[in-house]
Each structure stands twice: as C-alpha cells, then as structure tokens.
Amino acid sequence: MSKTKTNDPGAHHASSGALIRRFLPYLANYKMVLCLDLFCAALTTLCDIVLPKIMSIITNSAMGVGITLTAGIVLKLAALYFVLRIIDGAASYYMSSIGHIMGVHIETDMRRDAFDHLLQLDHTYYNNTKVGTIMGRITNDLFDVTEFAHHCPEEFFIAGIKIVASFVILCRASIPLTLAVFACVPLMGVVSVYLNGRLRARFRQQRVQIGELNSTIEDSLLGQGVVKAFAAEDEEQEKFAKGNRAFEQIKTLGYYAMGAFNTSTRLFDGLMYLVVILAGGLSLVYGKITAGDLVAYMLYVTTLIATIRRIVEFAEQFQRGMTGIERFAEIMDTPVAIKDAPDAVPLQPGPGEIRFEKVCFEYPDDHNKVLHDVSLDIRAGERLALVGASGGGKTTLCNLIPRFYEVTSGRILIDGQDIRRVTLKSLRQDIGIVQQDVYLFSGTVAQNIAYGKPGATRQEIEQAARLAGAEKFILALKDGYDTYVGERGVKLSGGQKQRIAIARVFLKNPPILILDEATSALDNESEILVGQSLEKLAHGRTTLTIAHRLTTIKDYDRILVLGEEGIVEEGTHAQLLAKQGVYYRLWNQLPAEDGK
C-alpha cells in the first residue's frame, strides 16, 4: 500500500554555516523587528550586568572600602535597579511576544515556499516519495523553526554581550584570575562542538523515522477497508509496532547524546567555580582583591556560567531548528524537472489536433523504453481508443500530453505548437482528464465540481451537474450541492464520484479529453449512467480513451492497439476484427454476457 521508496534526498548533510545562509533571506524580511528584538535583548542584559556591580558597591562600602555606606546610597541604588527592572520587564514582553510572532511569520513563509515548490514537482517525485515523509517536512520539521528564528540571533547576541562584558569587568578585578577562569572555555567549546554534532545526527534520524511512521499510519488508516476485508489487523499492528520501536530506539539514543552534552557542561561549570574558589580565595587571603570585588567576581562568573548554560540548553533547540531548515532545504533543492521554458508562451486556442513525432519515453529510474519512436496524428474532434495489455504504455502515452512526464526524445504538438514551448498552465487548461480512481477533495459537492473552474457561479455548477447526469442523485442527498462528501469522497459511491468528476470537466470545457479507464471499476448500472455522461462530454472534443472493456469503444473513430513494440495495430473496430490480429484475439476473449 505504501510507496516503494522513501526518496530522502538529504543523504548529504549541509554544514551549519550553509544552512544559516539558506535561512538568512527569510530572517532579512523582518530585519526591523529583529533589530528591535536585539535592542530589547541588550536592555535585559544590562540588568544582569549591573546587579553584581551594585552588590560590590554595597559590600565594599559596608566593610569600609570606598564610599561610606548610607541609607541614601542604598535607596539610590535600589531606585536605579527598580527602574532597570521596569525596563527589563517591558523589553522581555516584547521579546516573548513580538519576537516569537516574527518566528511564526518566518515559519509560515518557509512552509508557503515549500508547498509552492512541491506543487511544481512532477509525478516521478511523488511516485518515489512517501506522503507521510512529505507531510512531516512541511509541518513538524518547520515547527521548531519558530523557536530557532526567534531565539538563535537573540541568544547568541545576549551571550556575546554578557561574555565580553564579564571578561572586561573581571579583568579589571583580577587579570590572572580571569585568564584562569576563561582557560576552561576553549576546551568546553571543543567538547560541545563534538557532542553537538552527535545530537544533530540523532535529531535527523528522529525526523526521518517519524516520517516513516507517519507513512505507516497513513497507509493503515486510509486502507482500513482493505485491512478489515483481509482481517489483517494483526499484521498492521506488527508493522506499526516495528516502526514505533525503531522510533523509540532512535529517540532513546538521542536522549543519551543529550545527557552526555548536558553532563559535560555541568562538569565545566564546576571546574570554573573551583577555579574561582581556589584562586579567588587565595587572592583574598593575600590582599590581592577586596571582599566586595570577590562577591562581584563570583556573581559575574555566575552570570558567565548561566550564559554558557543557556547557550548549552539552547543547543538542543538550535539543532532541532537546524534539522528543520536542512530538511526544508532538501525539498527546495529537489529540481523541478518539468517547468515552463524561458521563452514559453500561452497555448493558442485551437480545435485540438494532436501530433506525436518519433516520441520515445523511459522513466528516469528505469532505462527500458516504455514508448519507442511513436508517431501519431489525432484529428481535431476525433475519438481515439487505446487498448492493449497492461504495461503497454497506454496511460504513459496519455500522461505525456499534459506533460505529467517529459518525453525522452521526439516531440508532441497541439494545433501545431510544441507542448514544451507553451506554458504548463495554458496547456493543462486545454485538457480535461477523467480517471478510473477519482479523487474528490474534502468539501462539498459544489466545491468539488467548481474545481474545474475556480470562481464558477452556482448556476454554472448546476448546469455542469445536469450535463454530467449527476443532478438527480445530488438533489437526493441530504444537503444537495452543499453535502459534505467526506475525505476523498468516501460518502459517495464510485458512480457518483465519477459523475462529479465528469461535471468538473464539463465546467472546465476543454477541447481535449483524456478518459483513463473511467468506467472499468463500476457496476453495470453505474457504467451505463457514466457512459452516457461521457458520450455527452466527448461530443465535439478530441478524445483519447484508455479502455479495458472493448464493448465501450466499438463506435470510436479509431482504435490503437499498443504492445511492447509500440503501436501494433490501428483502425476501426470492424477493420481490426477483419485483420484477425491482436485486437481480434482480445475481442474473442470477452465473455458472451459482456455485450458482444
């Protein structure tokens, strides 16, 4: 039920610098908000830096060093700190609200771009990529970008100010002691970078595995009818349990990596405090530093360690954000194989004549040619049927016309215009497709019909339904045209869904029509009703029909029989029977009750 490959194009791992450069254009769109956020961050940092100095003044004054301590001085210092805390509160509010909202805007922009890019990717990408994986990339993977976008510049900016300010202030108190404390920082940095790399690898594995798990869940839930029909609940539970256990194991390894990272930072915290206790205590004993300065020194070291710890705690969030950006970049770096040529022009209106000139096609991951040197002229308004064994290239040939796939060589022309030289939008607007497996969107009947012509009036929608023979059953529904059809149209029968799909194409009113085995999965009654609707739809249009039931195409203008070597037979129903070739054998294999 699932697709065969995960197609994780992110087998390569971009460097952090490359990912940040990829992210910066999104951040630049909100540079004014960011600058104000960083200004507020500087204000909050000021409060943290000033407090140790206030405590140093009070302690030294109380011990007779420097100015004499009075109630007035205490009140002035308290008033100063009170004002700073008011400023800190206002700045913190801005950072917590507007800063996060900026992150939400960036996440929204990235998700929009990812979705827009996904819509441009061709069928090959979706044939090889699990929907659960794609969903994870444009939803969960970008959730962490909100926190990353807000906190990354803010945390590093605050850390930079505090570390530089602490270093300068600590050096003024005691250069040897400060150098001893900061000697721990490079070693801490090396260990942190190594452990951070392990942490990021674990987060990436988690994202890949949750995509696999989502695909398993999606398969089981969407295919619940098949699961129940085959009493395969146990197999589905085992399949889910296997994926769930794999995710559990990967997440467990991630927490081990996180534990090692946090433990290393605590050890370095303790080492820095130990240096202050030893070196600071000895400096106090030998009169190299005052008690007030040692108190301030300890508070500044505490501020420094708190800053480092905050960066360490942010590392997990940082790596989650980087993983999200990396997987976003992988989507955006997936090349758009089928797109408008630089000089593409809109397809000029015409009657709908189609020409294949020496067309060859092979799938990108399979070098066996599906079509080889196919040359074919289809007259405007002609009804052409394609028959033959499965795998003969019938659907592929039809899929080349709207450029769902690109020809390997040769060319296809519509009304004399090379389809690779016209815009995709104008090309596909001129082609209506009714498939065997109809997809209805979650919404109402009217909304699904209107998909054929965005902005269509209610009158146009109802007229299309009448032409498709769908009006009678629609009006019999509880809410008529406003009836909710369920996910993928689950509340409607196969024949009802087909007629809504036909109504869509009536509303679109294209000159070219492709019917891909549109009635092969229906019961006899539904087939008759849908067949009548298709007859009306095909009238006056160039129509290509892929048919398994040969009785439905007896009256077609021309029938092509496709095989491994290409077009093996061509002619009307009567002509092909007279040849007594492949078509003749296919016709004689039909059961007598099938309408022969």
Predicted feature locations:
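Transmembrane helix-loop-helix hairpins at lipid-water interfaces of multipass membrane proteins
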Residues: 34-94, 171-176, 287-291
